[in-house]
Regions:
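Compositionally biased, charged N-terminal/linker segments
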Residues: 1-34, 42-43, 140-165
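Aromatic- and Lys/Arg-enriched surface recognition patch
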Residues: 53-124
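Conserved beta-strand elements of beta-rich interaction domains across eukaryotes
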Residues: 45-46, 84
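ATP-dependent helicase/translocase motor core
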Residues: 106-166
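Short, Lys/Arg- and Gly-enriched loop/turn segments at beta-strand edges
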Residues: 46-53
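Short, compositionally biased strand/turn segments
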Residues: 32-36, 102-103
Length: 166
């Protein structure tokens, strides 16, 4: 489950009961069943931030949740968070605890971007091994609350975007 800093903030403030996806993910959503887990990744910070358990089949709802108006994330699931970390507690994908253990990163140099396809689209299925490993380290991180300091660029990326409409 991909979150931008903006959708992370919206989900965090919404009661954390609904996860939403764009209409073009409906086919993938149809394969998700109650009991499945969504491993959450924050774009712009490149961090693993959570584990959500799905508690419903998908449904379509146009009521804004993630954006104040014209919310594009209308393909939705009811979820319950098993892990939901603050950005500075999220595990950077480039940290060895993640990088050296995932099938799509472990054989790559850290400056290689070939892995990004695995996290570019929401509802991309991870291997069972990668999913179980990420769930385990995220649960451990929920307990330990180790800090992964944010860089200046990370802090800038977390700030809400302001669009000048004049």
């Amino acid at each position: 489950d991909l979150f931008s800093p903006e959708t992370y903030r919206a989900f965090s403030e919404s009661g954390q009961e609904i996860s939403g996806f764009r209409e073009n993910r409906r086919r993938s959503a149809a394969n998700i069943k109650p009991g499945d887990r969504l491993i959450c990744y924050m774009t712009k910070l490149s961090r693993w931030i959570g584990v959500l358990e799905v508690s419903s089949n998908y449904f379509v709802d146009h009521q804004p949740v993630f954006m104040e108006a014209d919310d594009p994330f209308v393909v939705r699931f009811r979820v319950s968070p098993h892990v939901w970390l603050q950005p500075e507690k999220g595990i950077p994908i480039s940290n060895d605890i993640s990088w050296k253990h995932l099938s799509f990163t472990k054989d790559l140099q850290k400056d290689n971007t070939a892995w990004t396809g695995k996290v570019r689209g929401s509802l991309t299925k991870l291997t069972d091994e990668d999913g179980a490993y990420l769930e385990r380290i995220l649960i451990e991180q929920r307990e330990s609350q180790k800090s992964y300091p944010l860089t200046a660029i990370d802090r800038k990326n977390l700030r809400p975007s302001v669009i000048n409409s004049e």
